Amino acid sequence: MVAELEFEKPLVELRRKIQELKEFMKTADVDLSAEIEKLEARLAKLENEIYANLTPWDRVQIARHPQRPTTLDYIERLFTNFLECHGDRCFGDDEAIVGGIAKYDGLPVTVIGHQRGKDTKENLRRNFGMPHPEGYRKALRLMKQAEKFSRPIICFIDTKGAYPGKAAEERGQSEAIARNLFEMAGLTVPVVCIVIGEGGSGGALALGVGNHIHMLENSTYSVISPEGAAAILWKDASLAQRAAETMKITAHDLKALGVIDEIIPEVKGGAHRNADEQAKEIDRVLRRSLKQLLALDGEELVRQRYEKFKQMGQVSFLPETIRAR
């Protein structure tokens, strides 16, 4: 059973009524087909209205859905012969990041991604998808290996952020993130990054320096969570919904700002409704990205990546008051 979100409550009520009528028809000698048909038509119309007019906060809720497909879900559906690699060769193995070698339509690739859990036990094991420094160093080790053997790199981004604990800071969390940014900028192989859930702060960006950056339609990508932004700006985390509206964290906002390259459509209601169909949408975009990038040599890949990030945040015009000075 799929957990329903707050904004889906009207749909839940209608579905419940339809189910009750169907159950009643089984036990009573009454034909309620016409009534059920009307309710189903009303449900379909309401679904279209709700999912076509999602607010940024609605999308935050979908991105955080406990049953939303994870990196391993997509690896299972998109790749073959996946061999997971463990450890950073410095400290340990961080299970908040998974990565390894696989084949994508026969092409050897390296796949890396944040991995959260879907229940309490797995979330504790995966640290709720918040990596320690050794996770980022493991990712970097796999990236450098991919570069050595000329394998394209595919990164799945899905984290609230890097783990901010004392031990993580002592082991060099900020250095590990900064090192990944530096090294990813200079990789001579294609790098495709896909935001599949939450993309939070430097913890997400440490896997996000790619030639192509795509986002699932209901994913988010931001420097801080809406709750964190609200707590800083207005000293009240309960204003997270207002912050989400202001922060421009949705795929549509980021496409307009030039931060991402393509929005990957989601199945109605969110990727958690049908992981198989969602994987097909990702496959379509990923296949096209790799075809374009594999045609470029290493020097051109580095240049393209550099120019891409250099253009982010550039001012395209100056107000008259500034020009007058």
From Swiss-Prot:
Recall the GO molecular function terms of this protein's record.
acetyl-CoA carboxylase activity; ATP binding; carboxyl- or carbamoyltransferase activity
- Localization, UniProt: Cytoplasm
Q: Which residues form the signal peptide?
A: none
Q: What is its EC number?
A: 2.1.3.15
Q: Which GO terms describe its cellular component?
A: acetyl-CoA carboxylase complex
Q: Which reaction does it catalyse?
A: N(6)-carboxybiotinyl-L-lysyl-[protein] + acetyl-CoA = N(6)-biotinyl-L-lysyl-[protein] + malonyl-CoA
Q: Does the keyword Lipid biosynthesis apply?
A: yes
Q: What is its main location?
A: cytoplasm
Domain spans labelled CoA carboxyltransferase C-terminal: 35-292
Coiled-coil annotated spans = none
For the biological process aspect of GO, one term held by this record is:
malonyl-CoA biosynthetic process
Report the InterPro entries cross-referenced here. Acetyl_CoA_COase_a_su (IPR001095), ClpP/crotonase-like_dom_sf (IPR029045), COA_CT_C (IPR011763)
Q: Which residues cross the membrane?
A: none
Q: What class of enzyme is it?
A: transferase
Q: Name one Pfam family in it.
A: ACCA
> Which key words tag this protein in UniProt?
ATP-binding, Cytoplasm, Fatty acid biosynthesis, Fatty acid metabolism, Lipid biosynthesis, Lipid metabolism, Nucleotide-binding, Transferase
Task: Give the family this protein belongs to, as stated in its UniProt record.
Answer: Belongs to the AccA family.
What is the documented function of this protein?
Answer: Component of the acetyl coenzyme A carboxylase (ACC) complex. First, biotin carboxylase catalyzes the carboxylation of biotin on its carrier protein (BCCP) and then the CO(2) group is transferred by the carboxyltransferase to acetyl-CoA to form malonyl-CoA.
Q: Which HAMAP family match?
A: AcetylCoA_CT_alpha
Q: How does it assemble?
A: Acetyl-CoA carboxylase is a heterohexamer composed of biotin carboxyl carrier protein (AccB), biotin carboxylase (AccC) and two subunits each of ACCase subunit alpha (AccA) and ACCase subunit beta (AccD).
Q: Tell me what this protein is called.
A: Acetyl-coenzyme A carboxylase carboxyl transferase subunit alpha
Per the UniProt record, the source organism is Geobacillus kaustophilus (strain HTA426)
- Lineage of origin: Bacteria, Bacillati, Bacillota, Bacilli, Bacillales
